Amino acid sequence: MLSPAGKISLQSFTGSSLVFFVICMFNHYYGITNLVVNTLIVFFYAVNVYFFLKFFYNEFAFAIAIRAAFLGLVLVLGLYIKLVAPPNIQIFGGYMSVMALFHYSEFLAIAIVQPKQVSTDSFVINHSPQYTIAAVSSWVEFFIETYFFPGLKEIHWLSNIGLCVCILGEVLRKTAILTAGSNFNHLVQCEKSSDHVLVTHGVYAWFRHPSYVGWFYWSIGTQIILINPLCIPAYTLASWMFFKERIYIEESMLLSFFGQQYCDYQQQVGTGIPFIEGYKI
């Protein structure tokens, strides 16, 4: 059963997506290609959505609804850019849609498995300064290279490989969340709850940390989509270092929770990320 917050997010995400899709189709049909006009259309649509949701929802529900609606807008806008933009800009549209789907599906997955803990943080849109800096850096690289080397951003077969990597990573991560159910949490837990059990079946029989494996490859895939030769290795290294530390801390907690049971699990199943061993006793 989807929580009330999950239902609000789903209504806002799908509603915003569908309405903006209709607007984009009208826009395409009438051949409106002026950048200023299109920017104003997006701006006025966003403003109208803001006040519409503000009128109907209380503070907490509005905070969820506006984020979900924004992600729905970004999803469709990305698809529209992918369809009508110049060849060297089209891949950025695909990237926008991938980002929107990832962040919305993060919230929806938590709303399903942890309905009592869901919050605006569950969108993981701005969960750390490092994440924001990394995202902005990739945008800066993309547009600088688009300006000076437009042909680089027209290698669509390579960008499509990145899209496939993102899809596989996304599916793996969300499968891991749904498999773990109430045992999954965005934050490393320092105390074992009474209903916390060690999950070792499904994708957890493949990797000890399938949600991290999915996110690791998804993050690299986003930069392959953008064909960012600088950010691809930078994201790979930064993500690897982040998950190395995260897994080390998390496994120290899991060993204290489950003892020999987790130790045996470590012996049987790897972390899933190359050269990361985790916490060993």
UniProtKB/Swiss-Prot annotation:
Localization, UniProt: Endoplasmic reticulum membrane
Organism classification: Eukaryota, Metazoa, Ecdysozoa, Arthropoda, Hexapoda
Swiss-Prot/TrEMBL catalytic activity: [protein]-C-terminal S-[(2E,6E)-farnesyl]-L-cysteine + S-adenosyl-L-methionine = [protein]-C-terminal S-[(2E,6E)-farnesyl]-L-cysteine methyl ester + S-adenosyl-L-homocysteine
Listed transmembrane segments: 3-29, 36-53, 59-85, 89-113, 119-149, 156-181, 209-226, 230-243
PANTHER family: PROTEIN-S ISOPRENYLCYSTEINE O-METHYLTRANSFERASE, PROTEIN-S-ISOPRENYLCYSTEINE O-METHYLTRANSFERASE
Binding-site list for S-adenosyl-L-methionine: Q189, H196, V197, L198, V199, Y204, H209, P210, S211, Y212, E250
Binding residues annotated for substrate, in chain numbering: R246
Family: Belongs to the class VI-like SAM-binding methyltransferase superfamily. Isoprenylcysteine carboxyl methyltransferase family.
Organism: Tribolium castaneum
Membrane topology term: Multi-pass membrane protein
Coarse class of the protein's main subcellular location: endoplasmic reticulum
Keyword list, A-Z: Endoplasmic reticulum, Membrane, Methyltransferase, S-adenosyl-L-methionine, Transferase, Transmembrane, Transmembrane helix
Annotated coiled-coil segments of the chain: none
Gene designation: ICMT
Protein name: Protein-S-isoprenylcysteine O-methyltransferase
Its job: Catalyzes the post-translational methylation of isoprenylated C-terminal cysteine residues.
InterPro entries assigned: ICMT_MeTrfase, PPMT_MeTrfase
Lumenal-facing ranges: 30-35, 86-88, 150-155, 227-229
